[in-house]
């Protein structure tokens, strides 16, 4: 505070000195004009035109204008708080910024995302379904014509076994395709295979009126096997 008061006093003194110098220079100029063309000198050739001399006298009131800087002296007073402001920057709020590194913790939850693709391994149980296939081929081993004629109803159930046989060939292309991509497309061909199974048994039943029922069944199974393999290959290509 003492320093600020000293600064303000120095500013006032300087302003007063400057005002005094300005007034002295103005007075000296007026004195020069008066001595050069004063009304006292009657022999002055410029006495008659000296009438405009009052103009310098009019300028004489101008010296008070330099005195106005005195009010400006209080202006330095506000500058005194300036030294006090540097004390405020002492706030060490900036070191708190390192707290932001806490945000990198968020990416950690994203790391488990790559682990989720491991879930597509679930389709692996699908190949286990073909296990019943070896048991079903035992049924067509009895090609008795009399039994086929007497029991036409079981014929529709017989075509069901060939459907599981197709998945045996399906696992071969399955490993070639990436596990995470196929699970989405692989379920599509599965329902298509059973759709074709019930359609063909109808024709086999109509043809099972005589002893030629056995070859028709084998032909239907071969067709189903071909169509199933083609569907599986097409699904694998689409997945790629």
Swiss-Prot record:
Residues 220-240 form a propeptide. Disulfide bonds: none annotated. It is a lipid-anchor; GPI-anchor. Coiled coil: none annotated. It comes from Candida albicans (strain SC5314 / ATCC MYA-2876) (Yeast). The keyword Metal-binding does not apply. Induction: Up-regulated by TBF1 and upon milbemycins A3 oxim derivative (A3Ox) treatment. Residues 1-18 form the signal peptide. This is Predicted GPI-anchored protein 58. Residues 87-103, 193-216 have a biased composition (Low complexity). A lipid is attached at residue 219 (GPI-anchor amidated glycine). Glycans are attached at residue 207. GO terms for cellular component: plasma membrane; side of membrane. Keywords: Cell membrane, Glycoprotein, GPI-anchor, Lipoprotein, Membrane, Signal. Residues 41-216 are annotated as: Disordered. Its main location: membrane. It is found in: Cell membrane. Residues 51-86, 104-137, 153-192 have a biased composition (Pro residues). It comes from the Eukaryota.
């Amino acid at each position: 505070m003492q320093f600020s008061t000293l600064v303000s006093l120095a500013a006032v003194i300087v302003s007063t000195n400057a005002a005094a110098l300005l007034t002295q220079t103005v007075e000296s100029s007026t004195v020069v004009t008066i001595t050069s063309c004063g009304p006292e000198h009657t022999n002055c050739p410029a006495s008659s035109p000296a009438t405009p001399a009052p103009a310098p006298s009019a300028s004489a009131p101008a010296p008070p204008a330099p005195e106005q800087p005195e009010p400006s002296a209080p202006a330095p007073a506000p500058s005194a708080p300036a030294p006090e402001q540097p004390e405020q920057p002492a706030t060490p709020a900036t070191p708190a910024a390192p707290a932001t590194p806490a945000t990198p913790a968020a990416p950690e939850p994203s790391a488990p995302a790559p682990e989720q693709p491991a879930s597509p391994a679930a389709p692996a149980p699908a190949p286990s379904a073909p296990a019943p296939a070896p048991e079903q081929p035992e049924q067509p081993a009895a090609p008795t014509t009399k039994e086929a004629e007497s029991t036409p109803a079981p014929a529709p159930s017989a075509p069901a076994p060939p459907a599981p046989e197709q998945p045996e060939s399906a696992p071969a292309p399955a490993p070639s395709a990436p596990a995470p991509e196929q699970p989405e497309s692989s379920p599509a061909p599965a329902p298509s295979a059973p759709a074709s199974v019930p359609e063909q048994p109808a024709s086999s039943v109509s043809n099972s009126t005589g002893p030629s029922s056995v070859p028709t069944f084998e032909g239907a199974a071969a067709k189903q096997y071909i169509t199933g393999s083609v569907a599986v290959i097409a699904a694998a290509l689409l997945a790629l």
